[in-house]
Amino acid sequence: MQAKIGPIRLSEGVSRFNAATYLYACIICIGILAGLNFIQPYILSVVLDIPRSEQGSVSGSLAFMQEIIAIISISLFGVLSDRIGRRPVMVFGTMVVALGFALFPYATTINELFIYRSIFAIGAAALSSVLAIIVNDYPTEQSRGKFVSLHSVLNALGVAIFAAFLGRLPTVFTNIG
């Protein structure tokens, strides 16, 4: 018997738990990927003491570098997920994103910031590729549109939640001293 989540029919071999875990990952992963951009101004201002007049250039360069890394590596992670499975690539991506996210606030120079953002970018490429693959793997053909829509809504919700939470952290840290 085919599993369902509400009106969404899942492909053979995909359990409701698999789908629920994936949908949770849509909120968390995309929220974290976007979340780095919400804490970056605080790190540039307070941790690295970069003048506001230079922060746009640094932020743009960091974003550009992350996109280049994504363009170069995302197809590699797609192929890798076909060869070794979605789970190992997703676990790798999650661990590497966590490492980059954890190191990012400890950067003492702009060069370190670029190194830590590169680490984050590699994990982000792995996560992004697997999330895009699974959204097509899990539903049946008849339910694909509904599942993609739910995936997109949860991505947006994740960004909003993390923006609200992480966007307040600089104020909290500043008030603490």
What are these regions, as identified by a protein language model?
Residues 87-90:
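Primarily marks hydrophobic transmembrane alpha-helices of the MFS/SLC 12-helix fold
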Residues 100, 111-119:
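Paired small-residue
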Residues 60-78:
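Central cavity-lining transmembrane alpha-helices of secondary-active solute carriers
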Residues 119-131:
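Core transmembrane helices of Major Facilitator Superfamily
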Residues 85, 106-111:
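Helix-breaking motifs and short loop linkers at transmembrane-helix boundaries and internal kinks
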